[in-house]
Amino acid sequence: MKHYFLLLLLIGCIASGHAESGWKAHWINTERCQSETNTWLAFRKTVHIDKVPQTLTARIAADSKYWLWINGRLVVFEGGLKRGPSPYDTYYDPVEIAPYLQNGENTIAVLVWHFGKSGFSHVNSGLAALLFEAVAPGVEIVSDKSWQCTVYDAYQDTEAPYPNYRLPESNIRFDARMEMSGWNQPGYTGKMPNAEII
């Protein structure tokens, strides 16, 4: 009887852990991405929504920081946690996005900054990628191969001096000659490859 009780307890724990994952989204990045130090990735997706729900929470995770635009409007400035992944709790941001959506076509754009190194206050996952999920009746926006993604080459490393070794951030140079003007706006016509599921 004691073994039977332990077996039921174990099955319950496994089922509970599986149910908690419940994600329809996938971690995505681009074939060109090597998850190197100071990597910047641009993601975008156009979605059609017949009727915007009253509330829609997006669950967003990235290592390390991200910026979110919806229909050209900045919704999140420097989201994400400066600590990296943890095996003991969640590390995604819940973001209410319904006020930024409209009936019809919507453009979601996310810029991800992957530190690519650990510091005293950050644990590097080793993965430059995005996880995005917003699901409600009649609406499903999930990161998958239908998203577009590219390494944003305008963001570059600099020469020394570098930040203190305790910090995971890097110095940043932005080369405006390589800017992808309007990539985060509706109607962008530039070429971006489809994302890869990792």
Regions found by a protein language model. Give the residues of each.
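Sec-dependent N-terminal signal peptides
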Residues: Y4-C13
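Boundary at the C-terminal end of the N-terminal hydrophobic targeting segment
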Residues: G17-S21
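Short, solvent-exposed loop/edge segments of extracellular or virion-exposed proteins
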Residues: W27-E31
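Accessory beta-strand-rich segments of carbohydrate-active enzymes
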Residues: C33-Q34, N38, F43-E179, M192
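Catalytic cores of secreted or luminal carbohydrate-active enzymes
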Residues: E179-I198
